[in-house]
Amino acid sequence: MVLVSALVAMALGAGVTLAFTRNTVSERTASTAPGGSSAITQAVANRQAAAAWIVSQVARSTYVSCDPTMCAAAQSAGYPVGQLVVLQSTAPDPLGGALIIATPAIQSQFGSRLASVYAPLVLASFGSGAGRVDIRYIPPGGTKAFEGQLPADRQARIEGGKQLLTNKRIQPSPTAKGQLLAGQVDPRLLITLSAIAGTLPGKAELELVAFDDSSPGASPDVPLRGAEIGASTPAGLSAVLAFLKAQQTDYAPAGQPVIVKDKSGQQVVTVRYAAPGPLDVGSS
């Protein structure tokens, strides 16, 4: 599977030593303005939600850039301190991490350049309006190069999905088939599902129920990192679970895959890969 195997590539930035400071001046000033208390409460809630998402969804090896207050929240939530890159208010650019937590302070500091030059892709978003906090991907080559490769990136996933659908031991639901043909599925899932199908016992078949990503506010260009996977026999389902639990490095799922019942009552294995996924495969 040369085509699908070529779908994995990713670069991470370098980290710096973490140091924390108190809340920003703008946040302290807001508490004295009309409605300021409510705004502060919402700002704290948005930061906490972003920190919780980082802890539950992002690979622990990923460097994450953030302002001092946001980095403190991420550390408090459990993200490794050594992977947090603190951006002081004097930082000339937001570089240093593979992701950036774009709080209002960060958005104000870098303005429109944040998206147009450095971090074009929103992986998740919390809150709305002036208090919104976005988790953004920082591609190694910057926004222009990243956006230029998006069509090839999606086409590579489309071709990988088509190839997966030629496997007679894989039975997709209409929803899953549409997602595969639209290039919406993370390359790690494409590769893993193909491998699983080749290890099923007897005449068991792999049943693809749906692919998903529960991240709020994610860009449509972000591949789906999660899946519900069934099998035509109990032994087949057990084999799916065992295969996923045995994976390591790039193909190790985030958290433990488990068997649950889907909305129809069917037993399925749920699996999810960490963010960010391979987002530069078109240039590989």
Residue ranges of each PLM-predicted region?
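Extracellular/periplasmic catalytic domains that process cell-envelope and extracellular macromolecules
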Residues: V58, P92-G96, G129
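Extracytoplasmic
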Residues: D67-I100
